[in-house]
Amino acid sequence: ATAKVEKDGKTGFASRRIPLENADVRMTRRILQQSYYLAATKVLGTVPPWGALSGVRPTKLSTKCMLEGGSEKDAARLLEKTYFVTPERSRLCVDASKHTLEAAKLLEPGDLSVYIGIPFCPTRCSYCSFVSESIERFGAFLPPYLEALHREIAYTGKLLADSGYHIRSLYMGGGTPTTLSSPQMKELLRAIKDSFDLSRCLEFTVEGGRPDTLDEEKLRVIHDGGATRISINPQTMADDVLAAV
């Protein structure tokens, strides 16, 4: 695979090869990714710390490597040599994967995780690929959505109780769950507590993806409602980038 990248009068070329017998979809995508990255860095003059990786879960690669019998060094080598991740970031990934595998050992047959989605946000960020809509445009759909969600939570809770499954983690994501008003959040958390047996739940997270949707009252509602963790996602610490997206 050969890539050519042009920008501001500069041109970068890069090629990567694999034996024909190894040219399956995964390996073909890999050399395309590598050749584009190497050509682009020649033109841009910068080296991203996450190398050629894209997406939101870089630890999938290191965790998969270790699950298949690779060592921590093997996982770091994969990230650094194949995807050009910096040593600092590869160590971060491998460390996260190590803790992931340790946490997985706590799971027992019949354990599961529950995700509750709130597909609404104050506004929609330009880069977002999640199923979500802004309250400004679709706020009228929020009350009926919550009514349906309450019914589904009650039904799912009964289903889990009858089948003998146990919730080990519960995550309320979105969208931006903290788009809900404090009364709406309180009612939703009450429905969760009434319907689910959380006695074996190790972590109950409410995602507060937009800090501007949080205040003291809502934080108290989340705490009193049984959540043990909140996830605040600044996306970036650069104010100009935040304003742009």
Where does each model-flagged region fall?
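N-terminal [4Fe-4S]-dependent radical SAM core
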Residues: L44-V47, L67-V114, S163
